[in-house]
Amino acid sequence: MENKVLRLIHAGESSLAYLSLLSLAVFPFLDVMARHFFHTDVNNSNGYLVHLVLVTTFLGGMVTSRQKKHLTLSLELPVKEPFQAILYILVQVLCASITFAFAWSSLAFSLNGFEPGKKIGIVPLKWLLMVMVLGYLTMGIRFIFGQERIERPGLWLIPAVLLGSVIGFSSIVQVFAGSAGPPPAFLAVLQAPLQTVMTQAATPLIIVLVLSVFFGSPIFVVLGGVAYLLFAHQAAPLEIMPNQAYTMLTGYSIAAIPLFALTGFLLSEDKAGERLIKFFRALFSWFPGGLAVVAILVCAFFTTFTGASGVTILAMGGLLSYILLHGGYGKTFTIGLLTASGSIGLLFPPSLPVIIYGVTAQISVKEMFKGGILPGLALVLGMMTMGIVYAVRNDVERHRFQFREALTAFRESIWEILMPLIIFVGYFGVGAVLVKRFAVVVVFLLVLEVLICRESGTPKLLNLFFTFTPITALFFLLFHSPSPSWIVIGIAAAGSAAYGFLIAYFMDGLGADFRSVMPVFARFIALVAGLLILFAVTVKISLTLVESAAIAMIYTLIIQVVIRRDLKIRDLSKVMSKCLPIVGGVLTILSLANGLSYYLIDSDIPVKLTAWVHAVVSSKYVFLLLLNLVLIVVGCFLEIYSAILVVAPLIFPLGHVFGINPVHLGIIFLASLELGYLTPPVGLNLLLSSYRFNEPVVKVAKSTFKFLLIQLVAVLLITYLPILTTLLLKK
């Protein structure tokens, strides 16, 4: 009977989490529809949305704790039984006590943090915030009761509750003071001596807590616990922690994180990956390194949308490794390529780390995305170069280009290909400019065909149109001239001819017919450009980041469930069950790491660090080199979301002192952390790849070393050539 009740509770908990996650797309979507078709807005939709993010975070955190999937940095340290079992229990008790302290402070904040009559819709805000209390309380209990290795969990729950109550005692006093007048006398008597105890015990507890991360303590407990104990040490209000969590989670742009994450999981769980691989393989397998290029592009695509390199390695690693191994690539090369490619998409829109950095640094997220495009391409091209060089040196077999195969693959994957373009057009608002330039190009080419070539036969006309039109349009976009001059047109036409000659050279080497092969590449680009233009002309929508995320999620859901029918409605729960640990885990970390960021800033640590660095380091370039090294080390030990919240605030003032563009600093930050994922001994991608390919971490590290060097070169170029980041910022 007990197990049945527990299963019902778990099912209800999961269902509420799934519903809240799906519902995040509703309010942005309604806002878009109301604004563009009815010229109005949905009343207080942003308020509903951000508080729904709050609910999703803590419901997701509860589900994540039940699944034991909160992010950890657990190492296999040489500790033998029975000490290992004892250490495990002590770590779980410590984590539970810290989480119970969070619950006490959240309760005090919920009761006293807002005006009594404040509501979100018809729900009083203080009752809505009880989801924070419920979330922390549930996660704390599961540290004890959710562990099979703990016997008599009820016995261990008692010291966890007592220690958590001592750590959060000042919040307990605030709970009673706010809800029923003055606190009971015994609480007032205990407050002063317990505060003295916490002042003395905070430092050793912080040391123990930091060490516990190597024995399985979740990262959110360690980051939040360190901040909490630092505030307790200074006798500061402990309600700062839930206040900062609330502030972070109710920031408007944060809603894009769960929406894009769910979009990525919807894509990775059906046959979208297979279709994209088939499409890229049909287009690129005819030239040296084509299959490696396919793997890199697919990895970049999925990492961009999931925001987590681990998801790409785990979801796509098996299929991509099979294709590469059977395509003639060695096992060592394949593992190294896929491990290193797992994070190269993190600089492209709509990457979640870029969003979080922009929000944290208070920089335009759109500018961050613009700044990341060329550096991201540098990383991708570096990886592609490695693939091509390997294929040439090892004489990897190429495949003749098949027009029908490419056309079929394009038709099958068109819906997946269109999604990033729709996001790009909606968010960056390039539609109107593109239409003008495309029209000029079409007229120019028709005049060229009819008056100069004097041949208006359909086959050649279409061939010329489909071949050069989109490429010339691309050149116009790069020149970014509102009214293209004849000089610009001439340069664009020359570039088009050079492109055609290059493709013809490769195709001729394979013995292929240029006339039958060339148009397929151009038709692909032309069709995509045409659909993009049609979208821009008919809809004329300019979307916010969150609205773009909502449209992407709804679009993907419709494609995969209604049109493709790869996913059944009943299968959505499985997809969301895999997505929630990322959403709940990441947002929980962000909410608590924001408290640590607040402490660092409030204590003037960035100012002090800036003064010290400025006194020791006088050269901008030496500072940048040291920054690269520090961030690579940080990337080894901290996942990217924690690093952004904890480390980024420390470097903002340093960047200002040395005159570094804020967007450039952000791209350096993210690119260096990416490199840390590949750095031994505990780079995240190395650990995940070891798990996915069933190989020792040492062997994975050796396989990845050459790619690590290539990405190091790319990171140095990004660091010391700021034009790569700033070139597109003014466009």
Give the role of each language-model region.
Residues M1-P78, P82-A185, K540, T588:
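Alpha-helical transmembrane segments and membrane-interface helix-loop junctions
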